[in-house]
Amino acid sequence: MDLARKEFLRGNGLAAGKMNISIDLDTNYAELVLNVGRVTLGENNRKKMKDCQLRKQQNENVSRAVCALLNSGGGVIKAEVENKGYSYKKDGIGLDLENSFSNMLPFVPNFLDFMQNGNYFHIFVKSWSLETSGPQIATLSSSLYKRDVTSAKVMNASAALEFLKDMEKTGGRAYLRPEFPAKRACVDVQEESNMEALAADFFNRTELGYKEKLTFTESTHVEIKNFSTEKLLQRITEILPQYVSAFANTDGGYLFVGLNEDKEVIGFKAEKSYLTKLEEVTKNSIGKLPVHHFCVEKGTINYLCKFLGVYDKGRLCGYVYALRVERFCCAVFAKKPDSWHVKDNRVKQLTEKEWIQFMVDSEPVCEELPSPASTSSPVSQSYPLREYINFKIQPLRYHLPGLSEKITCAPKTFCRNLFSQHEGLKQLICEEMGSVNKGSLIFSRSWSLDLGLQENHKVLCDALLISQDKPPVLYTFHMVQDEEFKDYSTQTAQTLKQKLAKIGGYTKKVCVMTKIFYLSPEGKTSCQYDLNSQVIYPESYYWTTAQTMKDLEKALSNILPKENQIFLFVCLFRFCLFVCWFVCFFLR
C-alpha cells in the first residue's frame, strides 16, 4: 500500500479512538474492514465479566461498527478474541450483543454472518436493504422520545419515521393544542385531561404542605420523581433530555421532583444558591437539545421552571422542582441520533439533520461512498462500460471461439480488438472460463475509471465476471513486470461492491473477488494474485443463481450516470428503427 495513503488512512481511522474503532489497513479482503479491538465473546464469558463498563463499551463499539457498515455499503468487522479457549460453535456470541443486533435489524440473518478464524472473530455485514418502504438507514437509537401513558420511551425507527413524515407533511404543528368543544360534565366520568388540569393547578400554587396528598397521578402529561438531595443535580441533569424530548414531541406536560411514591409532598432541602444552580442547569440542558424544524417559524422550546415552597406547620422546610414543557412545533431530540456511517475514512455519527434527511427522503440518499483512495477524483465514464449497458443486444455480444455459448464477452468491438492484439490474453480467458457454466465477462479499459476512481495507465484492461454458482470476479491484466497492482484491484473491487448496494440497489449479499494476471511481451501469462485463495467468506456469499445474476447486471447498469442511460435509449431506438425499416422493405 502506498505509504502516504496508508498514513492518511491510519490517522483518519484512529480518529474514532474514543470508540476504539479503526479502519484495518492490512486486510486481504476487498472490503471496508473495521477493527474493534479485543472483545470478550461467548454468553457465559460475557456474563462473568467483572468490569460492567467494559462490557458495555465493547457492546457499543461492535454495535456502532455494524451500524456504520450497514450505512456504508457493507463490509467486515474484525475483533480479536479476548478470552482464551473461545469456540464460536460451543460458546456462541453473547446475549447482550445478540440483543443489540436484534434491536437494530428486522431479521439478523439477512444482514449479518459470523465466522471465527483462529483468534479473530469476523462479522460480515451486508449493506442496509432498500427493498422496503421503511427507514432508509440503520439506527441504534433515534433519540426521539415520546410519552406512552406514564412512561417516556424512545421511538423505534419505524415510529420515528412515521412521526417525522407527519411533521414534514404538515410543515410542523401549532404550539397550542386544538381546543375541543366544551362537554357537559358527567358525574363519575374521569379522563386524562382531568389529571392534567389538576397538575396545572398544582404547578400554579405558591405554597405546598409537607406530606400533603396529591389529587392526581402520573399520566401522559405528568411525571413524578423523588431524588435524594446529594444526587439531585446529577439526576435532574441525566433525566431532563429524555423527559423534555418526550413532553415536547407529544403534547407537553409537567415534571415534578420532590414527591414520593405514595403521592405525598416531601420536597428537598436547598439554599437559594443551589436553586439558582438548578435553574441554570435546566436552562443549559434544554438549550443544548438538538431540534429539527419542518416549519417556517423555527421557534425554540418553551418551558417554565419553578421551585414550589414546601411548608410544615408554617415553616419552610424544602422545595419541589416543577418544570412545565410546552408541546413543540417540530422534533426535539434528547441527543444526536445514535446512527453511524463511514465518511472521509472515519467512523462518524450522523447529525440530526443528516439522519432526518435519510429518514424522510422518499428516494435513497446517495452519499459519498467511503473509499481507500483519498486522492481519487470523479472522472467521466469510459466508453467500454457504456457499451456494456447494451451488451444484451445481440450485435454487441461476443462469443469467444472455444468457449461455451453460455459465456458472453462484451463489448464486442473492444473484445475483438483486444484479443487480436494479445493472443496470450485470449488463451488465458479460455482457460479461466473453462469451469464457468454460465456467465458474462464485461471488459473495460479501466473498471477503476468507470467507477469514478483514478485510472492506472499501467493496466492493460479489467474484466468483471458475473457467473452462476460463484461470486463476481474482477480480473486485472497488466504487462509491467515487478509492479504492485493489488491495491488498485482491491480498491476497485471494494468500490464496485459498495456502489452495487448503495447506488445500484442490489439487496442481496455479495462479495467481489479479485485476480491479477501478468502478460509478457512473448504472450505468456502468470497469475500474480488470487483473492479467492487468501480469504474465506460465509457460505451465503457464494450463492449465485440465475436470478442473482440478473439482479447484479441490473444493479451494475444502475451505477452508471444518467447520460449512459440516455445512450442506451438512443441505441435501442435506432435498433427499433432498423427493424421497422427491414420489415417494411421485405413487405413491399
From Swiss-Prot:
Membrane as UniProt keyword: yes
GO CC list: membrane
Residues annotated as transmembrane: 566-586
Chief site of localization: membrane
InterPro entries reported in the protein's UniProt record: Poxin-SLFN/SLFN_N, Schlafen, Schlafen_AlbA_2_dom, Schlafen_AlbA_2_dom_sf, SLFN_GTPase-like
Keywords for the protein's UniProt record, in alphabetical order: Membrane, Transmembrane, Transmembrane helix
Membrane topology: Single-pass membrane protein
Pfam families per record: B3R, SLFN_AlbA_2, SLFN_GTPase-like
Subcellular location: Membrane
Family that this chain belongs to: Belongs to the Schlafen family.
Protein name, UniProt field: Schlafen family member 12-like
Organism, scientific name: Homo sapiens
Gene assigned in the entry: SLFN12L
